[in-house]
Curated annotation (Swiss-Prot):
The gene coding this protein: rlmE
Assigned protein family: Belongs to the class I-like SAM-binding methyltransferase superfamily. RNA methyltransferase RlmE family.
Record's subcellular location: Cytoplasm
Pfam families: FtsJ (PF01728)
Organism: Bordetella parapertussis (strain 12822 / ATCC BAA-587 / NCTC 13253)
Region of interest (Disordered), residue spans: 191-210
Catalytic-site annotation from UniProt: 166 (proton acceptor)
Molecular-function GO term, any one: rRNA (uridine-2'-O-)-methyltransferase activity
Residue numbers binding S-adenosyl-L-methionine: 60, 62, 85, 101, 126
Name of the protein in question: Ribosomal RNA large subunit methyltransferase E
Keywords carried by this UniProt record: Cytoplasm, Methyltransferase, rRNA processing, S-adenosyl-L-methionine, Transferase
Length: 210
């Protein structure tokens, strides 16, 4: 009964969520688009000519935002957008997509080859591991995903590049922040308005490699 009540509550909340309705109106595939938009506006990030890598891209709302931000006068992408996800993603015009597991070395190598010789301006990561409900195990998974995004960004970003990554408050969060501060000159936390109040998610914005 409790599970059914939870499901009904979630459905009710989802249907009445203003960001869900706004996403439908604007053609975004998910309400998460508004999280990224708020962060980009606050940080004045992503502009024409940028090379952007979108990690954990499915269903594609962040890639859609990048596509809009990088659109030139004729509508074509002015820059480059490379997206990656374990799940399939419906094509977004002008976005190059890799389907694969970011934790696998072969997939990382494929992504690295695609950006070889082209330093990246911005890495955006909405990746989240499958959570088990076991605190210690989940914290380790979250930390691992954040560390993978960090290592990729440090290897491929321009010196003045930036990384936006989803994390979760809880055990291990302070270690994630500390590891980011060791590699970047500026690291801030942002909780966009589109993030649900009950969610422990937060976004780290790391800028300027040390």
């Amino acid at each position: 009964m409790a599970k059914n009540k939870f499901s009904k509550d979630w459905i009710h909340q989802h249907i009445n969520d203003p960001y869900v309705k706004l996403a439908q109106q604007k053609g975004y595939r998910a309400r998460a688009a508004f999280k990224l938009l708020e962060i980009l506006d606050a940080e004045k990030l992503m502009r024409r000519g940028d090379i952007v890598v979108d990690l954990g891209s499915a269903p594609g709302s962040w890639s859609q935002v990048a596509r809009e931000r990088l659109a030139g006068p004729g509508g074509a992408v002015d820059g480059r957008i490379i997206a990656l996800d374990l799940l399939p993603m419906e094509p977004v015009a002008g976005v190059e997509f890799i389907q694969g597991d970011f934790r696998e070395e072969a997939v990382l190598e494929q992504l690295a080859r695609m950006v070889e010789g082209q330093p990246v301006d911005l890495v955006i990561s909405d990746m989240a591991p499958n959570l088990s409900g076991v605190g210690v195990a989940d914290s380790a998974r979250i930390q691992h995903v954040c560390e993978l995004a960090l290592e990729f960004a440090c290897a491929h970003l321009k010196p003045n590049g930036a990384l936006i990554v989803k994390a979760f408050h809880g055990s291990g969060f302070s270690q994630i922040v500390q590891s980011y501060k060791q590699r970047f000159k500026r690291v801030v936390e942002r909780k966009p308005k589109a993030s649900r109040d009950k969610s422990s998610e937060t976004f780290l914005v790391a800028r300027d490699l040390k």
